[in-house]
């Protein structure tokens, strides 16, 4: 088989970078913060957590305050404000301020899953990656990818 070389432009729906065809996905991201009180009740009694030594985290079993940091990456399908990120951020912040979403005593993973549930209704059929951390220090990152054909 011979390679065909032409000076004519070739247009693809994907992108050619460094002479290799790649599949391109674009994302926007927004960040916001919410103050919250939570606890991890099992930490007070689980022997793996309430160790009584330098690994002890039994204090997590009592209510304690954090500034929860959120970062939401959302797939977009064109580069001209498919989703306006300032509006998306305001919508997400409002979900917490009006009580549609609540922090309660939830883990970072639970908060990320709850936030995905709301995002996927507001902006459906997109891939998401959501990060939630306690004070910007420790947290989770969960990717939600659409299943082909659904």
Segments from the language model and where they lie:
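Charge-rich, low-complexity N-terminal segments
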Residues: 1-150
């Amino acid at each position: 088989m011979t390679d065909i070389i032409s000076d004519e432009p070739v247009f693809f729906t994907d992108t050619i970078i460094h002479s290799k065809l790649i599949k391109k996905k674009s994302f926007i991201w927004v960040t916001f913060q919410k103050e919250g009180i939570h606890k991890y009740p099992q930490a007070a009694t689980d022997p793996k957590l309430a160790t009584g030594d330098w690994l002890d985290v039994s204090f997590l079993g009592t209510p304690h305050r954090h500034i929860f940091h959120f970062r939401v990456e959302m797939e977009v399908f064109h580069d001209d404000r498919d989703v306006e990120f300032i509006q998306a951020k305001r919508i997400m912040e409002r979900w917490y301020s009006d009580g549609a979403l609540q922090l309660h005593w939830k883990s970072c993973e639970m908060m990320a899953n709850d936030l995905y549930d709301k995002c996927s209704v507001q902006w459906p059929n997109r891939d998401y990656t959501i990060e939630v951390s306690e004070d910007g220090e420790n947290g989770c990152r969960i990717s939600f990818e659409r299943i082909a054909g659904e």
